[in-house]
Each structure stands twice: as structure tokens, then as C-alpha cells.
Amino acid sequence: MSAPGTRQFDSTKPLPGLQIERRCFTVVDGDEMFGLPVQSVQTIFRIEGVTPVPLGPADVEGLVNLRGRIVTAVSLKRRLAKAPLDTARGTLAIGIEHDGENFALIVDDVGDVITCEESAEIARPPHIDPARARLTSAYYRLDGGILPILDMKAVFDFAERNRSTGSAHLNTAITRSDQ
Amino acid sequence: MDELLKDFLTETAEQIEAVGTQLVLLERDPSDAAMIASIFRLVHTIKGTCGFLGLNRLGQLAHAAETLIGRIRDGATPTPDAVTVILAAIDRIKAVLAELERTAQEPEGDDEDLVQALELQTAAVAVPARHPPATALETAPPEPANTEPSRPARTAEEPALQVRRPETIRVAVGALERIMLLVSELVLARNQLLELTRRQSDDTIKAPLQRLSGLTSDLQDAVMRARMQPVGRLFSSLPRLVRELASEVGKKIHLVTEGAETELDRQLIELIRDPLTHMIRNCAAHGIETPAERLAAGKPEAGTIRISASHEAGQITINVIDDGRGLDIPRIRQKAIAVGLAGDAEVARMSNDDICRFIFAPGFSTAGAVTSLSGRGVGMDVVRENIEAIGGSISLSSTLGQGTCFSIKIPLTLAIAPALIVQAGGHRFALPQVSVVEAVGLGPGAAHTLERVQGAKVLRLRHEVLPVADLCQLFGLADQANDWDAKLVVVMRVGALSFGILVSAVADVQEIVVKPLGASLAHLSVFSGHTILGDGSVVLILDPAGLAGSLGLQRTSDYNVTAPADLTAPALERTRLILFRAGSDPLKALPLSLVSRIESVASDRLTQSDGTLITMHQGRLMPVVPASPDVALTNNLHPILVVSVGGESMGLLVDEIVDIIEEPLEIQIAGGADDIVGTAEIRGEAVDVLDIMHFIRQARPHAELRGVARRFKILLVDDKLFFRDMLAPVLTSGGYVVTVCASAADALALLQRGIAFDAIVTDTDMPEMDGYRFAEAVHEQPRCGHLPIIALAAHPTAPVLAAARASGISAVAGKFDRRALLDAVRTCLSFKDLANTELEQRVLTEKAA
């Protein structure tokens, strides 16, 4: 029940009349840069004391105690299926809450908050690896390069993935680490 | 809703419960004047308030009931008929109140029937003239004080009421839960602080910290106590239940309750309500004999059901004892053999208590007649499951002709649990202490030894041989000390199952606050949650039931109901299999139908390209995947199984082809790894049956994306883990991709998220939403209108088939009839052209992209 006279605004949508733009928090993984929707980033911290989860998904590094709260640490590198399983773990993490669960997304480095104008959005290049494309919601043309925006829903879709029988992330990780 | 009405509803709900109980007591002891007065008072208050709030229908009913009760209070004997009609009136009042609570309106309809019956009884019960009215107030019209909706007037005439209602305030359950949660966090913070200061010798901080620690414990205790309620709350509804049961089965039954003041967590009180009711039903229906039988046996005519609650070492014990005929052991033995729970020889070796435990097996009932009370084949197994689900246990003992005693043990609370912190492979895990029986050292000279049987570890403990789960092995952890001597086996008991867990050490015993796993990890059945230890580190909490499952033990496996041998059943279908060796693991197999050719390729013709092996096959490049990571690449010729994937081929590299055989393929253990469907016993040897889809995904990832190798997707819904685990491999081995759900609600949630399935296989008998209603709900979903649904029933009888047809279910299969299930699925899907649907979906997804 809302009091008369107040209006509810959806903070994720632009107010009418304003230039449509999107603020992104940039993160670096290897030589690639990604954008995260700024409203989904809660905190940035160094993780220590990770408790691994045996039998858990390969891209879940483990559980971390973040100020008395248990968060699930997910490696962006493994999520993108770039790293063989034994790569040393980074310690820089971004706190993100998704679907009631607290996650720590482990990245190599963090960058600035940048503003992406609607006019700079480009269509998804069609030949991007479908597994990768699935994790991305949009692409923006910047001066320095193209910035893919990570889709938080797809990145943290464990619940769905665990329910389905497939485990594509494992397969990719294994084939790539054969080398 | 009106505040007054809300207060009225909460208040009356409790009072009306009390009236029902007291009336039953009154029937037994009509001389208790104080009780009559309090019953009268309650109905009187309801009537008064109804007038005040303008609830006419309720008012009339309450008035009629009040008149009759008033007559009884004035000295009339409460006949059973009078009590029955008063109980009926109270039931009606309850129903009207429930409706009021939902809609804030009195429901339509009148209660003329009941009002008349009440008036009839009022006329029938005679009032002896010698009883003058007790006080003036009781016959007076409602006074302003009585119409106060939130509280019955506390006047000097009501000493009984005053004693019964000590000073209390209402607190929302949510508020208590929140306090509990905060205290849990406080306990954790305290533990962390203690851990930090343990290494310091600063005395200035030690004293206040000790005090903080003590206060925290006290606070925790106080909050736990606030959540506690006397178990009498649960007992209060029992006299009425027993009265009804007794009249229904035509027996005389006394109920005795003891230890009503024993307190336990309110959450648990609600959770044991159903199991307890069920057990009492059982006692009334099976335990207690008819009056004639009892007299013939030299017992008093009326049977007694005694329910007692007591505290025992951090647990609550509730006993349900009857003085009836006791369990009929020979009959249970016969039935157990008949339904295939055990063999003749096995049963002969069993003790009476062990045989009694068969009544906890699913679908086990020795009752000849099916009554509305019991004997429907559902019962004690559900009781056992419910009790075990809250970390409790149930046992029974019985003496023929003298009675039966069921004993339930449950923990005091679910929120904070003592746990063993165990170490394995350098990691720590928490193990709930309630399931731990003992820890057994394996050092030299120890009385018990760990042995290997065909690679599996077992512990010989006294006269038992227990399967042992090696945590390091199970979790793939590097094991520093490969020396069993230094290790421990923690012996666990879940229900009737015992097993061991091999760990390196027990590091600590701590009280842990159990927190559930997030969605990302909730699928790991071996963990039940996680917690933060005193030193701030996170540990996973092992789930004893899940661990038992990982050993292949099922909660119900010791009662494994196998259908009685059916001589007319068709023999299992035989499958042509290719057996081969790849890597060091057991023999592997693939259905031959999947293999189009077997080639021999020299190592030098295998080229590495982009991380994948490639070879030339029939003039085209073909990716080759090793069937196991440790297939040796030598210079010899390598056998390669060529598998066709919709026009493209891939090779599966193996070490050696062993044989091609024709055998019935029955997956006995569902695969844990991605690359196998499961393990089957072939010619007395365990063979891994490979999941070819896994290798196709590796070699030709796009083939699957394009859908050429797509398989039908089936959603399996069953509330019982046992059946999910049994049927999922059956469907998988039938070539389907199976997703399992434990409830109709979960399944609907999946469909709502747009996950597409080609067919649904659902149990019919599920709590909350049964299979029929689920089927209807599915067909109401967008895009699911024509989704074929196959129902599982214990016995596909005519009424089941009719109900299934009415709710749009395509076919019904028996739960234990694998062949019928696969046939039904195949028939339902036969009209679905895989290729066409695939094309359609592809076009749709491309459009969407």
C-alpha cells in the first residue's frame, strides 16, 4: 500500500525525457574487459580463506566468510571457460547478490565506472562462441574497444544449470586443459 | 480487516480448541463444576461478542449451544448424544470462523439443523431441581464487560480461568524467529572472539569476555525457551480425537497423557502433530481390541492409550503405549515374505523387534479390512519418514496380548545443533552429532579393522559389517596420509541404516548454526548446509542421509519392496552391447546400435589439432575422443568406435575391444560421473555404460547445438527419493534426458521458467498437490497444453485410470513395472516428430536471438 501522492520509479529504467544510458562497472579478466551493471555491484573485497566445495560446479571456487556472511565465490575466468582447472586463484572479488544468494565474482582487476550511451550499443557479432555469448547481455562500442556487458542472470544461473543434466562447463574445462 | 474482528478471531480460535477438549473430559467426569463453568464462559463470550460485532449466524449457533451447556452446568447429565451435538456445533463455529478469517464476512447459509438438534438435546437433558444457578452472572444477558472482544472478563468468579491464563503477551512468530536468528549470529561472533583471544594472554580483556560469553549463552538459552511450548498444546486435541476414533470403531478407549508440561520448540510441535495423530489412529484401529475380545482375554473392557512426553539427554522422548493385542508377529513375517521384503531364511534369523520394524516399510499393512481409519497401506512408513526428516528416530516394542509401545525421540530444536568437526584430506566438515553413534580408531591393536571387499571399504564392528564412505575418495581430495592406521571411522545411523565415514581426525565438537546452501550448491545431496566456525572459517555440513545415498544405501533400502516374482512377466529385453577396455577403470560398454563402424587407426595417423585428436575417416576429418582420460597413446594400432551423429561422425578411442555380447541391460547404479549412464552387471562383472552424448558434446559441440542428436527430455516428478533414484536411470537407459523434481510445485516452477520438456512422468500420490491436480495445472501452462503426461501408480486399477483420464493424463504405468513405463513413454512420444519439433524450435530461437 503506497501513500497517496507517491510514485514508484523503477531505478533500473531511465526516467522519461533523459538520454538513455547505462552505467557500467568494468572488470578485467586476462586481456579482456567486461562491464557489469553498476546496480548489481555491492562491494569489492579481497577474499581469503576459501573453503572448497567438493563435488560442486567447477567454476565455484568455494565458500568465503564475508563479514559473517557466507558467500559463494565464482571465478569469472572459469565461468568463461578460459582457465584450466589448476590455475592459481585470484583474490580480488566483487560482491554481488543474485536471486537471494550472495556471490563473490573473482576477477583479475577492476576498472572504472563508465557510462555507455545507447547510441554506442552494437549488435552481437554473430560468430562469438555461443557459450560465451550466452553470458553477455549487450555490447558497447567504446573509444578503447568493444565492451561486452555480463548478464548477471546467466553468469549465476547455477540453480538452473544444476537441475538440467548437462554440465557443459565441465566438458569445456576438461578439453581445454588437455593441452 | 477490522481490528476488533481480528482480535476476536485470534482469541476465539484458542478458546474453542480448549472447549472441545474440556467437553470430552466432561463426558467422563460430569461432576467437575469448575470445568462446566469455564466451558460455559467460553461459549458465552463468543455469543456476546458475536452480538457486538453483528455476526448473526454465529450468534444464533452460539446461543443454542450456550443454552444446552447452561443446562448441563445447572446439573443435567451430559449424555453422549448431547456432547456429540455440542461438538458438532463447535465444529460449525470453527468453520464459520475460518471463513470469517478469510473473507471478513460470515459465509452464506444457516445452521437450522444444528440449532434444532441443540434445542432437542436441551429439552432432552433433565435438570434436577436441587441445583440452583451458581452465580447471577451466568444467566444474565451479556454485560458490557463480556462484549469486550479481546479478553474474557476476569472477575472474581473465575478462579479456574485465572490460574490457567498467566500473564502473557502475544508475540508474532516472525519476531521470535528474528530474535533467534540474531542470537545465532551473536553466538557465532562470540565463538570467533573466543577463538581470537585464546592465543592472547591479555588478562584485561579476558574477564569481560568471559562475562560476555556467559551472557550470550544465557541469552541463547532464554530465547530458545521463549520458542518452547509445552507439548500439552499438542495433547489438548487428542481427547477429542480418541473419542471420535473410539465411536467410529466401536471400542472403548481411555486416553492418558503424561508430561504435558514438557517443553519443546514450537516448530517441532507442529511437525510431530501429524505423525502422533497417525500413531494414535493406528492404536485405536489395530492395537485396541473390541470390548468383547478384551473381556474374553480377561482385560478391562476399555482399552487405554497412554501418551507420555519426557526430557532425556537433550532429546524429547514421546511414547505412545496401548494395552491392546500387540503386533501379530507371524502375520507380519508372512506378509514381509509375501511382498518380497525378505526371504524365508532371512526372516527366520530375525528377532521379533526386527520383524516389528517391517511395519515401517512403505505400503506395508496387515489390516485385513480397509477402514477410513487405517489399513490403507499408507501409514507407519510416512510416520517414520516424518520423524526422521526432523532428525528424530522411532522404535517400537510389542508383546502379544499385552500391547505395543511406540517410542519417538526428537531433538529439542532444529536451529542450533551440536556437531562434530571432522578432517579429511586437509579439509574440515561438520557432522551433525545427532546421527553419530561412535567414532572408532583404526590404529594398531584397535579392536576394529577396516577391510576392503572388491575395492570397497567396510568396517567390521562387533558383529556388524558396515559400508564405509572414504571422504577423501568421495570428494576427490588429495589424501596426505594414506595410512588407515592414523584414521578414524565415524559410525553413523540414519533411521535403520548404519554406515561409517572415514576421516583423518575429529578436530572439535561445536554448536553450529545450520544455514541452508544457496541455489548454486543446493543440488549437492551430501551437504545439508554450511556454517561459520569459531575461527571464522566456513565449513560445509555433511548430510548423513545424503552420504548414505552416496554409498548406495537408500533410506528405504532395507525395506526395499520388490514386486513378488511374477512368472508371467516377460523376460528382460536383450541389448547387443560392445564391451571394451579404456583406461584402468572397469570394463566399459556401449549399445552396439550406437556404433556404426569399428576402425583400427595407428597412432601416427592421429593428429593433435586445437586440443582435439583428429584422424582421416572415409576421406573426411573426424574428431577422436578418448573413452577415458587415461587411454594410452602408443605406436600400436588403436581401436576406434565410430559413432554417427546426424551425418557427421566422431571416433571414440579405446584400448581394446573385449567382446560383443547380447545381454539384458539393466542399469543398477545411476552414473555419478558425466561420462557414464550408470553401472550394470554384465556376466557377473560391473561394467560402466558410457553416455555417448557426453563424448559427442566434446567432439562435436555444434552437432548437439544444431539438435541433430537431440534426445527427448523427460521431467520426472516424485516426492520419494527412492522412486526418483530408481526411475531416473530407467528412463535414462531408455535414451531419454531426465530432469527430476521432488514436488509438483518445483516442477511447475521449472515449466513456468520456460524450460521445455517432451513429456512428464509423475507420481499420482504426492503431498500438497497430487498427480492429477498437477496434470491439470501443467496443461493450463502456456505451451504445455498438449504435453503428454504419464502417471505412476502403485497399481493401475480402474478408478486410477478413470481419474487419470479425467485429468488429461495420457497413460498410467505401475511404479515397479519398468517395461510398462518405457512403453508408455515411447507411445506418448511416438507422435512427436523429433526432427520437426527441433526445426520449429530452432526457427523460434533464431527469431528470438
Region spans (language model):
Chain A
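An acidic, low-aromatic, low-complexity terminal/linker signal
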Residues: 1-179
